[in-house]
Amino acid sequence: MRLWLVAALCSLVGIAQADTLSGRVVAVHDGDTITVLDTNRTQHKIRLAGIDAPEFKQAFGSRSKQNLSNLIYNRQVTVDWQKHDRYGRTVGVVLVDGHDVNLEQVRAGMAWWYRQYARDQSPADRRLYEAAENDARTAKRGLWVDANPGPPWKWRRR
């Protein structure tokens, strides 16, 4: 019985662990989606976890994409990922020189913290992302210059 319990717990730990991929950013599609080319010359479409950036036709959509491009285009990145979304994209946290690019998009006011997927984040990351969004809102950075910016999850339902 104990052995079974230990085996079950070990398998759960394995599920929760993130996989990692590294490569160079070869495309920035919008403020929360990129393509990474790994050392085997395989392209991976990456959806930045924990954030939702304005759609391209929304206010700040092109600025969000440009900000992300400035941060990571043609740079070496590491992606810590745990799953694929329904579109086949790898969902993960993108790191450049150890810095969380997803968080930087929120901090710059170029994306919302995506509360719908907060359960996928650690408690520490939830606090960081929430604080970054609140700080950007208070400072009226990026999309927060508008009093009530329309979030992309509502815009997509139109």
Predicted regions and their residues:
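Small beta-barrel nucleic-acid-binding modules, primarily SNase/OB-fold domains
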Residues: 2-5, 10-158
